[in-house]
């Protein structure tokens, strides 16, 4: 399963660890993904999504029905 948020599309990015001596080594910055279930009242069922914390905030702001409509338009869910 890819480490990608289903709502925002956030994915791992690449950067550097930087030591005190300014040595740089490659590392990955992973999105803060959570597996969450949301109850959709209009459909009277639960929907499971793998969302980042930013995606959870977006769902709180716009509502699960609006977010699901966007996902279905993109063909995600």
UniProtKB/Swiss-Prot annotation:
Stated family: Belongs to the bacterial ribosomal protein bL28 family.
Encoding gene, per UniProt annotation: rpmB
Protein name: Large ribosomal subunit protein bL28
One Pfam family per UniProt: Ribosomal_L28
Molecular function per GO: structural constituent of ribosome
Record keywords, A-Z: Ribonucleoprotein, Ribosomal protein
Biological process, per Gene Ontology: translation
Cellular component GO terms held in the UniProt record: cytosolic large ribosomal subunit
InterPro entries in the cross-refs: Ribosomal_bL28, Ribosomal_bL28/bL31-like_sf, Ribosomal_bL28_bact-type, Ribosomal_bL28_sf
Gene3D superfamilies on file: Ribosomal protein L28/L24
